Amino acid sequence: MTRSEDALETSTSDASLARSKARSAEIDLAIDQDPSRFRILTGDRPTGHLHLGHYFGTLRNRVLLQDRGVDTWVLVADYQVITDRDGVGPIRERVLGLVADYLAAGIDPERSTIFNHSAV
């Protein structure tokens, strides 16, 4: 890569980051003004216990959005485990464990909808 190509790539990355930050700030303000305009669909595959990476990567933000009044739907993607693994293992226990982890992290079933993909 030449210096000019490297500079252009850096410039493009910086511009993209700046646009992303600006858009995030706009959405954040809009949520503060009227959280009922927003809905989030998120979830995990029940392949084992959640860990700190899940918490800092997504769970913390899910709880924050829920607490701000965003309509929050949390999917337990059990069908994905069934279709993309050689064996499903103890899927029932893993689904229950995942829901327990959600509750422990602060997902409130009174304010969020938690559901299994296989139940839809």
Segments from the language model and where they lie:
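A glycine-rich helix N-cap at a beta->alpha junction
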Residues: E93-I114
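N-terminal catalytic cores of NTP/NDP-binding nucleotidyl/phosphoryl-transfer enzymes
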Residues: A30-R92
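Internal, well-ordered alpha/beta segment that forms a basic, Gly-enriched binding/recognition surface
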Residues: F115-V120
